Regions:
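An amphipathic, aromatic/His-enriched active-site/gating alpha helix that lines ligand/cofactor pockets
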Residues: 25-39, 47, 57-91
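Short, low-order "capping/linker" segments at domain edges
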Residues: 92-96
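Short, surface-exposed ligand-recognition loops at beta-strand->loop->(often short) alpha-helix junctions
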Residues: 10-23
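A short, glycine/Asx- and small/polar-enriched loop/turn
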Residues: 48-52
């Protein structure tokens, strides 16, 4: 059963959000090199530009854990950025 995970990160300022976005630019290549197939979208709020929304789709719980473990190991995000983070996890009921 597919899983959708939405994470809303609110950074202290626009520069921190843009740093996160620039680091995230290499995410797809890293996942491909690790042979991890995951669908994701990373977007920036137009009304609150220091806010970044990530939407990930995983095949199942094991796949989610594997991808998240890889991303955590690859993270170059300084702890000093420490965004406020809210995450939502759902199971997919209908999809097209």
């Amino acid at each position: 059963m597919a899983i959708i995970r939405v994470t809303v990160r609110t950074f202290q300022n626009l520069e921190h959000a843009e740093l996160f976005l620039s680091i995230g630019a290499s995410t797809k290549d890293g996942l491909n090199k690790a042979s991890l197939d995951a669908k994701f979208t990373i977007s920036q709020s137009t009304s609150q530009p220091n806010q970044v929304v990530s939407v990930w789709e995983y095949k199942d719980k094991d796949h989610m854990n594997e991808v998240r473990k890889f991303l955590s190991a690859q993270s170059r995000l300084p702890n000093s950025l420490a965004p406020k983070e809210i995450a939502y996890e759902t199971k997919v009921i209908h999809s097209s």
